[in-house]
């Protein structure tokens, strides 16, 4: 292994606004990921039967719950792109409201986001919630360190079968 390869940063999580194509690479990969699904069943009560009959209703949308993004202004200035950490905040906030000029019920929704997690998953989602915690502030009030905790919910436009999911390999 060369020294350059040893010093190279690993691939990072990328968020892409599906509507505009704008991509935002995470400063750090979140340290953990919770992928949540729920299988929904109707519970049918049959008189005289000792148990409830379960009837499959559907599966909830996959959620990536509580994904925590850590942003540090000092670390960001050391990077080649020298990004402003508040740009990530603006990017996330823009994913929570409809874009300008949208009309009609279907179009009046926040844009979808593509979550690309290298070697693990690629999911088209919407932002279900976002919470910002400002951890360190400068004397002049600038934010130096903050976390953004985001819950993403998958959006599916087609029916998914168990065979398709079984073949899914990152």
Regions found by a protein language model. Give the residues of each.
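Acidic, Ser/Thr- and Gly-enriched intrinsically disordered low-complexity segments
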Residues: 1-170
